[in-house]
Regions:
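Unchanged
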Residues: 1-166
């Protein structure tokens, strides 16, 4: 699929109070589903549609997200170590073609404050997709963007009615 020329901004800074037992040691986007973090699943959805440029707005325990991505290649591919040379080489792999900016947007920042802090990562009038780092949905990104472009609006919102919690 052709890559869509845009960035995805993902909010990943909330406390995750409803998942307190999981979020004592990590932020909610790093809670695993099927052995991979929620954040990874969200990024894979966009990547399936050719969108591979991400800005992650880090907050609560953002260092966990930074550590995950800074070690991502090592955990997802074969490596060769030359111990006496203190070198590591990564073998050919099928790693995702992602560019990931991990931005510390403050632990207590609200949504608007997080967006303000990443302003320098987005060019004027550059289209972006914006999503929360704790929601995985079956959305056809290409169709959503085509719908948005067809209607010529500044913002298109995708929403759903969540099922009851109890």
């Amino acid at each position: 699929m052709n890559g869509l020329k845009m960035k995805v901004v993902i909010l990943a800074g909330g406390l995750g109070t409803r998942l307190a037992e999981e979020t004592q040691t990590k932020p909610k986007p790093m809670v695993e589903i099927g052995g991979m973090p929620i954040l990874w699943h969200i990024m894979k959805i966009y990547s399936t549609y050719g969108v591979n440029d991400f800005i992650i707005c880090c907050g609560y325990k953002g260092y966990v997200i930074k550590e995950y991505f800074s070690h991502y290649s090592m955990h997802m591919t074969d490596i060769t170590l030359k111990i006496n040379e203190n070198s590591i080489s990564f073998q050919k792999s099928n790693l995702e073609p992602w560019t990931v900016a991990l931005v510390d947007t403050g632990q207590n920042s609200m949504t608007g404050g997080r967006l303000k802090r990443i302003r320098s990562y987005i060019k004027n009038d550059e289209p972006i997709c914006f999503t929360y780092g704790d929601g995985v949905a079956d959305v056809n990104i290409s169709e959503l963007i085509a719908f948005h472009n067809k209607h010529g609006k500044k913002v298109t919102l995708t929403a759903t009615h969540p099922p009851g919690r109890y």
